[in-house]
């Protein structure tokens, strides 16, 4: 890819932001409501639900599903506003693992697939992928939605 130092395995990781708790303003308590991007939710209720970290990868690919070494079961698909490509929803098939992922193409660049993972796998990788390093060289990582 253009603009990357091919000598570094981590060169394509343009940005990685870790999920952080919303900041509370002076005088607010943790159970108070926090307004974020047009919707409000209780900080306390997101703790009870056990909100998981989310990571998004942008990859240039002709196929929507990249082999990441885990096995996935598709459980849904929906049309998304302002995007002609549907978003697909998957769950890890390993018993007791609650990791989910969403896959969708970008409208502005149809060759880019955005894969968003929610959670951390509770088991080792199920199958080795020979092309995993090739996938890593094409990825951009984003986090915190």
Swiss-Prot record:
GO cellular component: nucleus
Subcellular localization(s) per the UniProt record: Nucleus
Segments for region (Disordered): 20-55
InterPro entries, sorted: WRKY_dom, WRKY_dom_sf, WRKY_plant
GO molecular function annotations of the record: DNA-binding transcription factor activity; RNA polymerase II cis-regulatory region sequence-specific DNA binding; transcription cis-regulatory region binding
Described function: Transcription factor. Interacts specifically with the W box (5'-(T)TGAC[CT]-3'), a frequently occurring elicitor-responsive cis-acting element.
Annotated protein name in UniProt: Probable WRKY transcription factor 75
Organism, as annotated: Arabidopsis thaliana (Mouse-ear cress)
